[in-house]
Amino acid sequence: MRRLARAGLIGCALWAMSWGGAPARAQEVPPPVIIIVDVQQILRDSLVAKNVQTQMTQRTDRYSKEVSDQENELRRTQDELERQRTVLSADVFNTKMRDFQQRYDALDHGVQATRQALQQAYNDAMTKVENTALQIIADLAAERKANLVVTKAAVLFTAQGLDITQEVIHRLDEKLPSVQLAVPQDAGAGLNKP
C-alpha cells in the first residue's frame, strides 16, 4: 500500500515537472504597508461635504415653502369651487374642476421632477467630493508607500498612525472647499437660488 502511495507521489511530481519543470515557487509578496481610512467620516465631516449638505437643506426648505404656498392656493381654489357647486351649471363646474385637477396634477408632477433633480444634483456633488477624496487617499498611499488601504469599518483594532482620515479631511478642505449644487434651470424656481 505504501508503494502505491509513493508511486502516486512520484507520478504527481513527474507530472508537475512535465508542465514546467520544478514546482513553481510562490511569488514573493512584499510586507504589507497598511493605511486605514474612514470614507464615511470624510463624506460627513469635511468642509465641502458640510457645504453640499447645507446647500441641499437650504434649497429643500425654500422649495418646500414654495410648494406649501402653491398647495394652500390650490386648497383655497378647491374650497371656492365647492362653494360655487350649487350656483354653477354642471358644465361650467366640470370645466373648472378639470382645470383645477390639471393644476393639481401639474404641481404634483413638478414636485416629483424637482425632487429627483435636486437628489441628482446632490448625488453629483457628493460624487465629485468622493472622487476627490479617493484621489487624495491614493496620493497619501503613494507618499507613505502603502500597498494596502483598508476602510475603517473593516478594522477591529489598529496601531496608532495608520488611520489617515483626518489628513484626508484636511487636504480635501484645502483642495475642494465647496461644490455648487447644479440643479437644472427648469427643475424648480426656488432651487436655483444659492
Where are these regions (language model features)?
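Acidic/polar surface patches and capping/hinge elements
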Residues: 173-176
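C-terminal segment of classical bacterial N-terminal signal peptides
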Residues: 10, 14-24
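Amphipathic alpha-helical segments
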Residues: 27-153, 178-194
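Catalytic domains of cell-wall/extracellular-matrix polysaccharide-remodeling enzymes
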Residues: 159
